[in-house]
């Protein structure tokens, strides 16, 4: 009996070691990056310094070592063989193309925000995660970094905007179609139009919060019906974030931030801010498509 127990233990230990083994050389080959293994945590991490762009923060030139290095760390998964977490250092004109590459690869985007004040050019940080086969995860990371190289190769000079600026004319947005598509009753001001849709949350104090306390999705339109800007904010559950991001990016809407507005609320919400350009009808249907990915 003791012999049987010992053999069982050895087999179990062997299986655990096998499961925990991260193939660093394979990850290096698939990502094209050099990495290192933290043996105590069983994590293999690859890094990619942004030495291709000169960034100053508060007038001081930042070396990549001080926080301008993209990274991805691989560890054994629970439900699937491997998990990955990472942070990509991006310029403004790289963010949305890289986000699409990440989402198309099956990885998740979990945050998008700044780490500095007074940085020139402005730098954004996209946090990513995923679980699956190590090959798929590593290829997804590489696709994102290759997209950065592609953009900088085609346009070494950083873009100053999404495209041509909106014509400097008075706004004349017709809100009726927006209300009809979204099922809202919006507000007009100086030719602009805004709609707000609320959700419910219970705060840490037990207080109820809804639309007027900031638990809302909104969209504001300016320009003309034929050529408009839309900017706004989506409030989403954590389980809805990836579907909403994919829907907005599929329709050409730019994501400009993903973060929290609250702490301790139930259910837990994330907020994503967006910016789009096009005919009002097209933009409205893009927003409707993303809203359809959220709970009613």
Label every PLM stretch briefly.
Residues 20-122, 129-269, 275-296:
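Long, contiguous binding/interaction regions
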Residues 1-2:
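N-terminal secretory signal peptides that target proteins for export/translocation
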Residues 5-15:
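Bacterial N-terminal signal peptides
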């Amino acid at each position: 009996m003791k012999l049987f127990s010992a053999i069982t233990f050895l087999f179990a230990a062997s299986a655990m070691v096998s499961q925990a083994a991260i193939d660093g050389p394979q990850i290096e080959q698939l990502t094209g990056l050099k990495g290192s293994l933290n043996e105590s945590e069983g994590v293999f991490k690859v890094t990619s310094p942004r030495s291709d762009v000169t960034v100053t923060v508060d007038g001081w030139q930042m070396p990549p070592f001080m926080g301008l290095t993209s990274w991805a760390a691989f560890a054994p998964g629970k439900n699937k063989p491997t998990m990955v977490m990472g942070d990509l250092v991006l310029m403004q004109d790289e963010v949305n193309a890289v986000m699409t590459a990440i989402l198309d690869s099956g990885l998740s985007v979990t945050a998008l925000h700044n780490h500095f004040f007074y940085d020139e050019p402005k730098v954004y940080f996209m946090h990513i995660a995923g679980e699956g086969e190590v090959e798929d995860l590593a290829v997804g990371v590489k696709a994102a970094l290759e997209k950065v190289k592609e953009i900088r190769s085609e346009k070494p000079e950083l873009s100053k905007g999404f495209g041509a600026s909106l014509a400097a004319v008075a706004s004349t947005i017709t809100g009726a179609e927006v209300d009809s598509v979204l099922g809202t009753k919006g507000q007009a001001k100086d030719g602009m139009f805004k709609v707000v849709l609320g959700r419910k949350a219970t705060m840490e104090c037990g207080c109820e919060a809804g639309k007027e306390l900031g638990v809302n999705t909104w969209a504001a339109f300016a320009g003309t019906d034929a050529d408009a800007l839309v900017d706004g904010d989506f409030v989403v559950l954590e389980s809805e974030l990836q579907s909403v991001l994919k829907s907005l990016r599929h329709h050409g809407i730019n994501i400009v931030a993903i973060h929290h507005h609250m702490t301790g609320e139930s259910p837990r919400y994330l907020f994503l801010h967006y910016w789009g350009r096009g005919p009002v009808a097209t933009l409205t249907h893009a927003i409707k498509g993303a809203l359809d990915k959220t709970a009613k």
